[in-house]
Amino acid sequence: MLSLILFFPSFAFAVTPVTPYFGPLYITFNCCLFGDSRSDCTKVQSPMSLDNPQNFCPNFSLKSSSSMFFSIHYNNHSSLVLFDNFNCRIEKVYYNGVNLSPRNQYSCYDEGVDSYMELKTSFNIKLNQMATILRCIKLIQLKARSSFTTLQDVVCRTNKYLPNNPTFALLSDTVPTWVQFVLPDLSGKTICIKYLVPFCHLNHGCFTAGSSCPPFGVSYVSDSFNYGFNDATPYIGLAESHDNVCDYLFVEAGTHNASIVGNFLFYPTKSYCFNTMNFTVPVQAIQSIWSEGNESDDAIAEACKPPFCIYYSKTTPYTVTNGSNADHRDDEVRMMVRGLLYNSSCISAQGSTPLALYSTAMLYAPIYGSCPQYVKLFDTSGSESVDVISSSYFVATWVLLVVVVILIFVIISFFC
């Protein structure tokens, strides 16, 4: 009996933390994933092209890198695979951010990589913020614009592709005007509480070789919302650089107006619809890079920041030992993504395990789930300190110990 009594205190003080599994996991069994060609089981090269377990393919919604970003800006583009589905799950994991194309075909003018990257980062920051607190993500087409007899789509010089959402349209005069767009509160069976709407314009907003250039301004306006840009002294002449400048706005469902002062009218033709959930769950993102022979961007990493997002970074270059090509079937990512086959109790930036006993030094925000932690019972300088568990494990251990002690006294009293 004495050995039994001594066993439980020693158990309580001897247990050590478990090293977390590094990579995305889920807690609720209600998880959706946004991937790319590396998670596309319909490819001819599958499964040799996959970075994820083959039986997890149905949970992935995307088949091309950065397609959520491209889909908000392009309606039709032969070289892009756009997001035409929707997901309605609690936990969200992204592995789709590497693609740089069409970085040099994103504006009529040569804004280069930096401006494109800023837009991609800005979009994903807002997407993460929305996805953390809202449940369903659905891309919907908005109602067609009103008829304008003097309206024509802006056409780029050379072969560059100006994004066609928001639609950039050219007016024959500078009379202030507006076009109405509706963000519906219901799309099919999906309730839409909030929308992620792109608000874009070309800076230096005058495209004329003449001697004058009228002021330029554009805004989205409703009874409860007003956001705009105004350029009172636009540049004159075709030689000036014109960048495609975008903000990404959280807008409630309802009727809104796109108003314009100047020659250009900008109005949205599609938007991401979200509906609500009653709790906050950070999204998770896995670093997506090309092999060392190709250029990769870090927009997803820049956008994945606490408290909205947990980012899992690779520790090695993209390395393929048995894949379809040098950019598909990375060994390290396949190991990381295998965690999606199992559910967990605690998710953190350091990793996760099904039943982890974490030291306080292991965890930093954001975390979610049940994360039992060790704390110091006492700490004397120079002497040995003792760890106990500040969680249900601690309570359960000592409750069991008390029960055993009581049983011992009962047995002793019975024989006495």
Swiss-Prot record:
Structural protein that makes short spikes at the surface of the virus. Contains receptor binding and receptor-destroying activities. Mediates de-O-acetylation of N-acetyl-9-O-acetylneuraminic acid, which is probably the receptor determinant recognized by the virus on the surface of erythrocytes and susceptible cells. This receptor-destroying activity is important for virus release as it probably helps preventing self-aggregation and ensures the efficient spread of the progeny virus from cell to cell. It is found in: Virion membrane; Host cell membrane. Residues 1-14 form the signal peptide. The chain crosses the membrane at residues 394-414. The active site is at S37 (nucleophile), H328 (charge relay system). Its main location: virion. It comes from Human torovirus (HuTV). Residues 264-379 are annotated as: Esterase domain second part. N-glycosylated. The lineage of its organism: Viruses, Riboviria, Orthornavirae, Pisuviricota, Pisoniviricetes. Belongs to the influenza type C/coronaviruses hemagglutinin-esterase family. Homodimer. Residues 122-263 are annotated as: Receptor binding. Glycans are attached at N59, N76, N257, N278, N294, N322, N343. Residues 15-393 are virion surface. The gene is HE. It is a single-pass type I membrane protein. Pfam families: Hema_esterase, Hema_HEFG. GO terms for biological process: fusion of virus membrane with host plasma membrane. This is Hemagglutinin-esterase. Residues 4-121 are annotated as: Esterase domain first part. Residues 415-416 are intravirion. GO terms for molecular function: host cell surface receptor binding; sialate 4-O-acetylesterase activity; sialate 9-O-acetylesterase activity.
